[in-house]
């Protein structure tokens, strides 16, 4: 199956010539006794930064950036999916010219050159009887870590037991999951503009390199669902410098419980 979509958004002045072209290709083929799904996607876009990036006025921040150029983006990616194996692999490359971002002063700025971003994500699920292990690994590489910082590696693993009890009326799920990403100089948050921006060079905070572990239990009985979770169960067991965003620490250990009951009309 092949698809192509072209959108022209140009109107007047600098908006003339805006466009976005999408292309998709879907293929299914046999591999031994399994069906493999292959997807190829790509797009080319040439668009002005958002109105918010070009014009903003408030008590603390003001800007009018009428001279901003269009962002030119090109991306190509491929995806391979084998459902029977629980395997999904996706990889892509993107080139961005005139990348628009919020600088160290939380003001919009454009990078006049080209930035390339390579990325690959592998999802692999394993099952042995009632035991399940879901995994997701993402690798990223940016050609300009100063303007577009990214964690090079992000991990998610979820190990759980899934079983049906009481004559298969009660579904029970017990497990633990962990999230982790490598250290990098993540964007800081500016409440005044409600946006993430590059960290000031004199106040860099490197975040990452710290796992967040949760344990949980889910019960499903007819129309009733009950869940319980201990979030960040490993709080206080490792580095005290644990942040999701610079200067915003991760929430401490937290217990959550909830009930969902569906009523019929």
Predicted regions and their residues:
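Exposed, low-structure sequence patches enriched in small/polar residues
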Residues: 1-265
């Amino acid at each position: 199956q092949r698809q192509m979509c072209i959108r022209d958004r140009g109107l007047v002045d600098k908006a003339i010539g805006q466009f976005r072209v999408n292309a998709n290709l879907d293929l299914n083929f046999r591999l031994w006794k399994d069906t493999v799904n292959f997807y190829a996607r790509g797009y080319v876009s040439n668009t002005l930064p958002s109105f918010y990036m070009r014009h903003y006025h408030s008590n603390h921040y003001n800007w009018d950036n009428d001279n901003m150029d269009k962002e030119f983006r090109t991306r190509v990616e491929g995806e391979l999916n084998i459902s029977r194996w629980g395997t999904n692999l996706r990889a892509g490359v993107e080139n961005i010219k005139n990348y628009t971002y919020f600088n160290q002063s939380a003001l919009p700025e454009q990078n006049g050159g080209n930035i390339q971003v390579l990325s690959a994500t592998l999802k692999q699920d394993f099952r042995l009887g009632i035991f399940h292990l879901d995994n997701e690994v993402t690798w990223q590489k940016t050609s300009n870590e100063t303007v577009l910082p990214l964690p090079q590696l992000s991990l998610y693993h979820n190990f759980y037991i899934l079983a049906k009890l009481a004559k298969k009326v009660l579904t029970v799920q017990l497990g633990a999951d962990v999230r982790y990403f490598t250290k990098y100089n993540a964007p800081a948050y500016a409440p005044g503009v409600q946006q993430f921006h590059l960290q000031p060079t004199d106040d860099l905070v490197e975040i990452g390199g710290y796992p967040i572990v949760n344990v949980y239990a889910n019960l499903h009985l007819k129309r009733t669902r009950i869940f319980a979770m201990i979030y960040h169960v490993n709080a206080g067991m490792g580095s005290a410098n644990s942040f999701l965003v610079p200067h915003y620490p991760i929430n401490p250990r937290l217990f959550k419980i909830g009930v969902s009951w569906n009523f019929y009309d």
